[in-house]
Amino acid sequence: MSATIPARDLRNHTAEVLRRVAAGEEIEVLKDNRPVARIVPLKRRRQWLPAAEVIGELVRLGPDTTNLGEELRETLTQTTDDVRW
């Protein structure tokens, strides 16, 4: 169950409410004692690794008996590592 706060408290204590949400809490905002919004934490974003780093880790793990290394080498030409964000 999520915590509830009046809209006035959200206005007056925004930083504290956002800290609670960042810590994983869901907060429902009330206006005139009725729920009007829910503030929820964002899902964690995937962290992408450069292809060379992934290959290096696979090499460190030992011999490839699945042919995965060869498939990855073929795929390296299709990566976006050189694209600037």
From Swiss-Prot:
PANTHER family: ANTITOXIN VAPB46, ANTITOXIN VAPB49-RELATED-RELATED. It comes from Mycobacterium tuberculosis (strain ATCC 25618 / H37Rv). InterPro entries: Antitoxin_Phd/YefM, phD-YefM_TA_antitoxins, YefM-like_sf. This is Antitoxin VapB4. One of its GO terms (biological process) is detoxification. Keywords: Toxin-antitoxin system. It comes from the Bacteria. Disulfide bonds: none annotated. Residues 1-54 are annotated as: Not required to interact with or neutralize cognate toxin VapC4. Changing residue 64 to A: No effect. No longer neutralizes VapC4 in full-length VapB4. The C-terminal domain (residues 55-85) is sufficient to interact with and neutralize VapC4; exchanging the N-terminus (residues 1-54) with VapB5 allows neutralization, while exchanging the C-terminal domain (residues 55-85) does not. Many single residue mutations in the C-terminal domain construct but not in full-length protein prevent toxin neutralization, they are not all annotated here. GO terms for molecular function: toxin sequestering activity. Residues 55-85 are annotated as: Sufficient to interact with and neutralize VapC4. NCBIfam families: phd_fam (TIGR01552). Changing residue 66 to A: No effect. No longer neutralizes VapC4 in full-length VapB4. Belongs to the phD/YefM antitoxin family. Antitoxin component of a type II toxin-antitoxin (TA) system. Antitoxin that counteracts the effect of its cognate VapC4 toxin. Upon expression in situ, in M.smegmatis or E.coli neutralizes the effect of cognate toxin VapC4. Interacts with cognate toxin VapC4.
